[in-house]
């Protein structure tokens, strides 16, 4: 039972609780209309201190498709944060007016702080380069739907593995399922943080390999998870420009991959996946975005205790 829990980190839920969410998501996918009134009278607060299109729209569409309503802001200048109001005060006030809160904030650990002051469930919609657990729910649901389960996969993760919060969350989550292996593809400047390597992978004896070129491992992966080089995480413009075009997935590279491999991406993409790949049947990133809405519908329904 996950009613009234916060979702700050993908590890906040047990594997059994995640399966409960995925089971409901499957039911919603099969018959969305059946669930179109379950959140009538409920209000989602959306507090986005960082720009977002897909995550914010996904949350808002999810609540609206459940029959609920939305209050919130899409950037801090339109809130009292621009006047210097503390995060704790904002959360205390918003939790009076809403039943559940989705928050994105540039500071790592901000979602955890928010949960200490909220009287309603807090969903972390991204806190700096730290965690993005609802993207992880989206990713897991996509893998479960398209690859027949969450175990025994070789997962290639390519691009910005240092600052990419979706990457950190995905590795932590998929490490809980047996038989998964990771191929970590990045320039040396953007390798995974030490705590992921040591505390998640090595500590749990999970097989992984770090490489610098996509071509040398693309034929081995079942799931290729592409990420963009995130300009907003760089203080040095020259370093960003040098690394931006490090890895571009195109038709030629796709020809080296397995016929049943799937390509995922948390979006937005810049140029790391060529548009020609969109027409390949293995391109799953737009279906992944669609599944994200259903994952968030199931999550909010469970946290609110309406299902």
Swiss-Prot record:
GO molecular function: amino acid binding; aspartate carbamoyltransferase activity
The organism's place on the tree of life at top rank: Bacteria
Keyword Transferase among UniProt keywords: yes
GO terms (BP aspect): 'de novo' pyrimidine nucleobase biosynthetic process; 'de novo' UMP biosynthetic process; amino acid metabolic process
Keywords, alphabetical: Pyrimidine biosynthesis, Transferase
Catalytic activity from the UniProt record: carbamoyl phosphate + L-aspartate = N-carbamoyl-L-aspartate + phosphate + H(+)
Residues the entry annotates as binding L-aspartate: 83, 165, 228
Residues the record lists as binding carbamoyl phosphate: 54-55, 104, 132, 135, 267-268
EC number of the protein: 2.1.3.2
Pathway: Pyrimidine metabolism; UMP biosynthesis via de novo pathway; (S)-dihydroorotate from bicarbonate: step 2/3
InterPro entries, A to Z: Asp/Orn_carbamoyltranf_P-bd (IPR006132), Asp/Orn_carbamoylTrfase (IPR006130), Asp/Orn_carbamoylTrfase_sf (IPR036901), Asp_carbamoyltransf (IPR002082), Asp_carbamoyltransf_Asp/Orn-bd (IPR006131)
SUPFAM superfamilies per record: Aspartate/ornithine carbamoyltransferase (SSF53671)
HAMAP family on file: Asp_carb_tr
Its job: Catalyzes the condensation of carbamoyl phosphate and aspartate to form carbamoyl aspartate and inorganic phosphate, the committed step in the de novo pyrimidine nucleotide biosynthesis pathway.
Family: Belongs to the aspartate/ornithine carbamoyltransferase superfamily. ATCase family.
Quaternary structure note: Heterododecamer (2C3:3R2) of six catalytic PyrB chains organized as two trimers (C3), and six regulatory PyrI chains organized as three dimers (R2).
PANTHER family from the UniProt entry: ASPARTATE CARBAMOYLTRANSFERASE, ORNITHINE CARBAMOYLTRANSFERASE, MITOCHONDRIAL
Protein name: Aspartate carbamoyltransferase catalytic subunit
Organism: Clostridium botulinum (strain Eklund 17B / Type B)
